[in-house]
Structures are given as C-alpha cells and as structure tokens.
Amino acid sequence: MIQTEQLSQDTILFHVRGPFHQNTAKELGLSVFRSYRLGFKAFLFNLSHVSLLDGEGARQLALIGQGLQDNGGTWKVIQPPSSVGNQLILRTSLQHFSQAMWN
C-alpha cells in the first residue's frame, strides 16, 4: 500500500507499507511519474513499514530514483527496512539528495 503526503510546494513523501516487490515498485513508479508531471521535484520514500524488500523491488526502486535524478529531481529513501543487506543497498545506491535539501 502506498500513501502520499505533500510536505511543501515541490516536495512529496511516499509512505510504502507491506511487501515491496515488483508490482509495488510499478505502482510507486506510476505515482512518482504523475507527481513529477504535477511539478514535484523532491521525492522522499519512507520504507519503515516495508515488511519485505526483494532484489527486484530494490532494483526497480533504484531505477525510479535514477530516472528522477536524470530529469533534475532529487530523492531520498528514509528509514529503510531493518534487513542489514537491504540497508547497505539503500545507503549506498539510493541516497541522492542535494546538500541544500538537508535540514
């Protein structure tokens, strides 16, 4: 399940719950695309309630982020799932936020 929260005029937060697999990634990708078309430029992904992040889901999430970065957007995964292996993947490949966006 994916819920969105607008944090500012150009920043949106996606709350993802449940298992994160290829279908969830596709749903998230469509939501990100729609939000980008509406003018959002900064994207946060809260994965703290994800119960399972499989390899294909992680790959799809990285592709979503790469697409945002290639088109001038910024993104960050916050509170990754507790699995050590997945945390390492998320920390090394999914943390692409400009320094100006940090609090």
Residue ranges with predicted function:
Residues 1-103:
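STAS-like cytosolic regulatory interaction modules
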